[in-house]
Amino acid sequence: MARVCEVTGKKPMTGHHVSHANNKTKRRFLPNLQRRRFWVESERRWISLRLSNEALRTIDKNGIDAVLAEMRARRDSI
């Protein structure tokens, strides 16, 4: 399963570990993904999403119905 947020689309980034001697080795910066279930009152069902912490904050601010409407406008499957 890809490490991608279903709402924001955040993906892993690449970069370097940098030692004290300034040696650089490859590394990945992974998004802070959480699996959460939300009760959608308008549909009378639970929806399970894999979200970044930023997406959780967006849902807290705008509500799950607004976020789902935005995802459907982008034609994402839910």
UniProtKB/Swiss-Prot annotation:
Give GO terms for biological process: translation
Task: Recall the GO molecular function terms of this protein's record.
Answer: structural constituent of ribosome
Q: Does the record carry Ribonucleoprotein as a key word?
A: yes
Q: Which InterPro entries match?
A: Ribosomal_bL28 (IPR026569), Ribosomal_bL28/bL31-like_sf (IPR034704), Ribosomal_bL28_bact-type (IPR001383), Ribosomal_bL28_sf (IPR037147)
- Keyword Ribonucleoprotein carried by entry: yes
Could you tell me the keywords of this UniProt record?
A: Ribonucleoprotein, Ribosomal protein
Tell me the superkingdom of the source: Bacteria
Q: Please give the GO cellular component terms listed in this UniProt entry.
A: cytosolic large ribosomal subunit
Under the heading PANTHER family, the entry gives:
39S RIBOSOMAL PROTEIN L28, MITOCHONDRIAL, LARGE RIBOSOMAL SUBUNIT PROTEIN BL28M
Q: Which family does it belong to?
A: Belongs to the bacterial ribosomal protein bL28 family.
Name of the featured protein: Large ribosomal subunit protein bL28
